[in-house]
């Protein structure tokens, strides 16, 4: 069954902000075995096991891993761009919104546009 999710290097893309673990389990015919962050909401960094393979969820714009896109994510991206922190793993991937490879001012602009309701970030 095609779930609509994309998998690259054990990272899974295509979740929507607010998706629940229970909803995902239904979409995947209950083949989702284990969630490691213990929340019911899917967020960047959620680790799960599907068919004996471990995967990590990535939600574009959810840079701090709380399952939302908000000013905290904007701050994390700003700090990364200024060299104050270094985003790694799924959080770095969640921040590369525009081209999926690097993080730059265009990604910062996309989060601002999302927060202002000008243009939503698509997963």
List each model region and its residues.
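Cellulosome-associated attachment modules in secreted, modular CAZymes
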Residues: 2-123
């Amino acid at each position: 069954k095609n779930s609509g999710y994309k998998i690259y290097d054990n990272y899974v893309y295509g979740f929507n902000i607010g998706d629940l673990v229970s909803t995902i389990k239904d979409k995947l015919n209950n083949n989702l075995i284990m969630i490691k962050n213990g929340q019911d909401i899917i967020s960047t960094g959620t680790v799960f096991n599907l068919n004996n393979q471990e995967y990590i969820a990535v939600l574009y714009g959810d840079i701090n891993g709380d399952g939302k896109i908000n000013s905290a994510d904007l701050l994390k991206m700003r700090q990364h761009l200024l060299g104050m922190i270094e985003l790694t793993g799924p959080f770095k991937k969640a921040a590369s919104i525009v081209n999926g490879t690097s993080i730059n001012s265009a990604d910062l602009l996309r989060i601002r546009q999302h927060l202002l309701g000008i243009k939503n970030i698509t997963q």
